Amino acid sequence: MAEAAAPGTTATTSGAGAAAAAVAAASLTSIPTVAAPSPGAGGGGGGSDGSGGGWTKQVTCRYFMHGVCKEGDNCRYSHDLSDSPYGVVCKYFQRGYCVYGDRCRYEHSKPLKQEEVTATDLSAKPSLAASSSLSSGVGSLAEMNSGEAESRNPSFPTVGAGSEDWVNAIEFVPGQPYCGRTAPSCTEVPPQGSVTKEESEKEPTTVETKKQLCPYAAVGECRYGENCVYLHGDSCDMCGLQVLHPVDAAQRSQHIKSCIEAHEKDMELSFAVQRTKDMVCGICMEVVYEKANPSERRFGILSNCNHTYCLKCIRKWRSAKQFESKIIKSCPECRITSNFVIPSEYWVEEKEEKQKLIQKYKEAMSNKACRYFDEGRGSCPFGGNCFYKHAYPDGRREEPQRQKVGTSSRYRAQRRSHFWELIEERENNPFDNDEEEVVTFELGEMLLMLLAAGGDDELTDSEDEWDLFHDELEDFYDLDL
């Protein structure tokens, strides 16, 4: 009996479940169901059935508008951009430098004038009215959603289901405050582009802005075009930018002058590169500009001849110890003595250009801290004639004075003091030709002694600095050292 009753019980239970399911189905038929698209689907959220959709087919797919809808023909939303009142304009095209060109997925069009924008808004009204008529079919569902939102957030105002702009609801944009359907009307946070009363008072008037050049048009293209409140200048023939003020003659002449100066510098650089690129070093026989190591692509310009050498080779030649000074200071080809070598990125031949290069080299050296002076902690053998900067940690410059104290021995300190005394005596009391040989001998002895003093002081002498100092002594005292 128990075994026979069990199937009956089961049948009774299943019949009750079927009746409940029928009642639930009948109640659901009165509420039209709308399948919301999945926000994380990356497309229109459609399934395999491409024929369905209903009212959604009249709504343009937002993913298709951005060119990233992965549903394709199966998307339940419309892929017809002609139904969309607004197109997605490429922001890079508006700035004037879209690299995709005609292959860009976004719209390449000029900004609309105010009249065209007004006409577009008027033509968009019928489509909004048609979309609002569709909202009656989903009214109950919208009311349910808004009721649930109101119960969760009682302070938020409820947005009616029959709003005309529900299709064009504000989307989330990174960097801007989000305004959803159940969120406040964003009055607390001013949207991007809005200004407060105080800011509007500080802004210049229309008359003032019309006198100022548009900064966007000056560097490329202004997205506002003819509707820009600022003045679009005339194009410069030199740089091609809209930077010439139509009325201000002083501004026009100043800009043209600066453009001409920049053009002349560019031409000088072009000529320098042209005469430099094929120069071959006379020692290693390599094209200097084609060396494998970029740091070796520099010339060593000799002060008294025009033979070509790379900086590495000529410095190696002049640092040889097995020859006397007269040999290593002379050019390897013509044997003309040059007191120093000027490093240069470009090849220079003219004497005036060499003088400019030497002056620039000295100025560059004067901006570098002297390693011998060491911010007042050391002692520089060149004293006030040093080409490097003698400055203390607080920025104060060293006052010119005689160097009386050495670093390694009392004898060298006395000889250095005597050296500077001879210089002061030469400046105050010019001597005759009979005493010139004695002074020449003294100066030569002092220079040789100072050059040989680096080992005891654990300092490495700068060849360029000694060469420049030697040349300055010869020019100042008219001596041949």
Swiss-Prot record:
Pathway: Protein modification; protein ubiquitination. Gene3D superfamilies: 2.30.30.1190, Pneumovirus matrix protein 2 (M2), zinc-binding domain, Zinc finger, CCCH-type, Zinc/RING finger domain, C3HC4 (zinc finger). Pfam families: MKRN1_C, zf-C3HC4, zf-CCCH_2, zf-CCCH_4. Residues 236-263 are annotated as: Makorin-type Cys-His. It catalyses: S-ubiquitinyl-[E2 ubiquitin-conjugating enzyme]-L-cysteine + [acceptor protein]-L-lysine = [E2 ubiquitin-conjugating enzyme]-L-cysteine + N(6)-ubiquitinyl-[acceptor protein]-L-lysine. Keywords: Metal-binding, Repeat, Transferase, Ubl conjugation, Ubl conjugation pathway, Zinc, Zinc-finger. A zinc finger (C3H1-type) spans 55-82, 84-111, 208-235, 364-393. Auto-ubiquitinated; which leads to proteasomal degradation. GO terms for molecular function: chromatin binding; ubiquitin protein ligase activity; zinc ion binding. It comes from the Eukaryota. Highly expressed in embryo, in specific cell types of the central nervous system, in brain with the strongest levels of expression in the mantle layers and in testis. Moderate to low levels in somatic tissues. Disruption phenotype: PubMed:12968785 describes 80 % of lethality within 2 days of birth in heterozygotes and polycystic kidney and bone deformity in survivors. However, PubMed:16882727 reports no apparent developmental deficits with viable and fertile mice. The keyword Repeat applies. A zinc finger (RING-type) spans 281-335. One of its GO terms (biological process) is cellular response to leukemia inhibitory factor. E3 ubiquitin ligase catalyzing the covalent attachment of ubiquitin moieties onto substrate proteins. These substrates include FILIP1, p53/TP53, CDKN1A and TERT. Keeps cells alive by suppressing p53/TP53 under normal conditions, but stimulates apoptosis by repressing CDKN1A under stress conditions. Acts as a negative regulator of telomerase. Has negative and positive effects on RNA polymerase II-dependent transcription. Interacts with p53/TP53 and CDKN1A. Interacts with TERT, modulating telomere length homeostasis. This is E3 ubiquitin-protein ligase makorin-1.
